[in-house]
């Protein structure tokens, strides 16, 4: 048996008849399956034991030989070999066909491969194969052409006239004869000559034929093998037959299809032996052809063969296709043992890296470990008695279980797993009950809540797997989100509210202005009711143990509140004392104004100052990010746990609740609405007089009501008490926002109707006042559309992620530096005057391609190939530099992946990316995961043409599939000046005057111009509003412009929705879309014109001929959508498991393709370790070394040591 981790590539090809016979263990001659009385397989039937092996281990059919000792003996009575029953999963049989039949994949696929080889149309082929026409196989000395079709009548006429000087025949035999006669070399040379002159359709056809013929010539497949003489029969265990209760049998559809083939084949043999009339034989041959077609691909031609209840039978092709097919069901997704699932509940007392596992579940999952330990401790004599003990749940089992699960991480996964944080490792602790306990801070990453969600548990078994789980996957390690490098474990809801309440300040609170010698005294005073958490007090600065205070500050008093003293205790010692929610306080030190001299009048000073704002969710996030930046993972996870505990404790103490009395209705509301209504009446008057159009009236009414709502919202927010519980919830970022509050207390505002158009009648009531029946009805549209949208969006977003993963799955960091001399020039991304993504955001974590100097002083800010950190990026942005040349995945020279320098920092760890990181998958997940947050709808604001641009998820799909966008912009193909804008009939024309020529562009009706007369314009820039078609842009400009455009557009969509994604993820995806070139002229290379080639293959082919001083080939870059790009990948396994399985496999078989197993999917399919991360060769030769207790003190010590 081949060791799965040791072979280099996998090859697919056409099977010759001899090859099929060599696989086979015997011929299947009868259609019988199982004898229904003895339940034994029939001899020579589809389940025959002599051919396929015994049904029971080490036992022949007749029972003469039983037991292992006869291993390998072939029984002299029944002829069955004594061996394991499992060989019935691998031994094949065959059927010798009485007449050749064509293989439907090669005859019916698009384009028809047989048709291309023979230069016949698929129609003609069909007529010959299904016995409707004769084809001339040898013309002899008659005026007939070879391959000419003849009807029955014509054939008879020619037979009478010329006798047997020519040969014509029907069916697959005739095609086989033609295929055998073909001389590949001659045909190829002939086509190459023809290509030099051919144009138009003849050229395309010639290129297609050349491709197929070259494929046959290079692969060693013979075209005649597309016609089958021998049909392989797959092993019986792969098409099982099982007895149901009640004596009936359930069988795989394949058995029915094979039975039909065998029946017809046997009938044909009998007819041939009897010498039956040709018309009967022909009919039988046609039926045999159809039976084989149905077996290989049922329903591809004509009506599918149906089983009971008119259900089409599943043929061999259907076994591979689709979500339920072999590829996606069994090869890419397998069920695993040592797993369980249960409902999750919150575990607020867990540490960051812990989870609670129900006792019963843990016992079942860790059974083998517990049994071994029971035997090891002498509590059981052997494994069997240990198993019995566990089944009877002896008390000592629990103690052993406790010791077994210590330090043994488990993986928790919640479906849908949208990104890598959907599976994380935890240390289990045993809990009573039957629910899994989950740490509240990891909920964001899993997108989990406790309303009945379920999660799955998996146990990593081997010590390597455990080490990987602990080092790479522990929840405490996964603090940053891979998509943007921001902390993903920020406190939410109650935790935010508690910390917000804790850091509030209140004027005139009890005990204001008291002075304490240290924090403990202040907390004691609070516990005894002398001061409140919100009271502003003074504490001796020297008692607050903080490294950032200067000596002078330590001699003064620090003005703060009791709550903030408590809050600051959770932060690391060398962190600034945080007294106000500002970045300067967070990153540098506590502002000096909070320190006052001892002996000053504290009460007066405090009374004269404004209240300082409390800490909202955003500030807490910034604190976490800053702690992570300075102290790395261990300290951060400890601090997070402390922050969580504080939050829960003080939100409980605060007792913040919501009642109807908290919602105060605005007094001036009626006035504002009256004013708005008067304006609306005025607009309607103008419309009736014909002064404005229907569109303008609609737009104005909408904007009047929107403004009215905004005014009400503004006034509400001003009139709100800062202590109002609802305000506190929304201000802290725990739940809700200003707009929710406006709907409760102000007015609901405008609603959209089911088609998405805004209804111009606003809902004037608020929820506090109550809605009228009509208002309630209108507002139900929106709610229902929301639900329907969400359901559709989830499916769409999931499919987008699947396509993204597929196209980028083989992008892995392969080397340290590719040594490229190209880079990408980047600046801030702007839309009009609004900055969508700042230069700072785009620079952090990238390597500089060229040295960056200060524009005024000329001082060097960044040197070439230096990593740009946050601090450097700030300096660069402040210095006024507009653009920086950086290393980018776009310009990386690495084959099948990227290098460390071009990729930059790994956002998930905040450190340099490691060789072996699967950055393609990370990129796909980072773009796909927020997909569900994007909107579905195209906004209709009264149907103005320019406004109906696609946004949200549909726009992302449009970009990545490289489709022609809706509302496409007209672009200029030359550099020049706008010379004229003319009105022609009902539309406009724009004339661009270049240096050499002028170009005229017709502007489609309803499009809005973006240019003015006399304005200079460069090629590839828009003349009208709208989205550019990237394929057009590629024709007019170069790859770089298209890459930048696509990157900019994707970022625009996500940032508009408030989702941040690192540029590098989009770069990886766009790079995969631009991998291929189309050869326009082959020069003296051996590539074929018109074919799609990988850029690297193309440069290799050219390098070969240039060394000999010959003519190189030329090619144009091609932009492929992600679906097309996935199907064009070099790996046929990856493409076949994605979509269009049969087409991909047909093509691969003819070309005799080799799959070099470079990507992840191919290796998952054949069961190898994936070539990423620790599965890479450079990490495979690694041993685990036991470390002594001394160096175990460092948490998460390096476990890997090179051999």
UniProtKB/Swiss-Prot annotation:
Q: Which UniProt keywords apply?
A: DNA-directed RNA polymerase, Magnesium, Metal-binding, Nucleotidyltransferase, Transcription, Transferase, Zinc
Cite the EC number: 2.7.7.6
Where, in this chain's numbering, is Zn(2+) 1 bound? 60, 62, 75, 78
* Entry note: cofactor: Binds 1 Mg(2+) ion per subunit. Binds 2 Zn(2+) ions per subunit.
Enumerate the residues binding Zn(2+) 2: 818, 892, 899, 902
What residue ranges are annotated as transmembrane?
none
Could you say which enzyme class this protein belongs to? transferase
Example GO molecular function term? DNA-directed RNA polymerase activity
Q: Which GO terms describe its cellular component?
A: DNA-directed RNA polymerase complex
Does this entry carry the keyword Transmembrane helix?
Answer: no
Q: Which Gene3D superfamilies match?
A: 1.10.132.30, 1.10.150.390, 1.10.1790.20, 1.10.40.90, 2.40.40.20, 2.40.50.100, RNA polymerase II, clamp domain, RNA polymerase Rpb1, domain 3
Q: Where does Mg(2+) bind?
A: 449, 451, 453
Q: Which cofactor does it need?
A: Mg(2+); Zn(2+)
Which GO terms are recorded in the biological process aspect for this UniProt protein?
Answer: DNA-templated transcription
Q: So what does this thing catalyse? A: RNA(n) + a ribonucleoside 5'-triphosphate = RNA(n+1) + diphosphate
What is this protein for, i.e. what is its function? Answer: DNA-dependent RNA polymerase catalyzes the transcription of DNA into RNA using the four ribonucleoside triphosphates as substrates.
Question: PANTHER family attached here?
Answer: DNA-DIRECTED RNA POLYMERASE (PTHR19376), DNA-DIRECTED RNA POLYMERASE SUBUNIT BETA (PTHR19376:SF54)
The entry assigns this protein to a family as follows: Belongs to the RNA polymerase beta' chain family.
Q: What interactions and quaternary structure are annotated?
A: The RNAP catalytic core consists of 2 alpha, 1 beta, 1 beta' and 1 omega subunit. When a sigma factor is associated with the core the holoenzyme is formed, which can initiate transcription.
Its recorded name reads: DNA-directed RNA polymerase subunit beta'
Please report the organism this UniProt entry assigns to the protein: Bacillus mycoides (strain KBAB4)
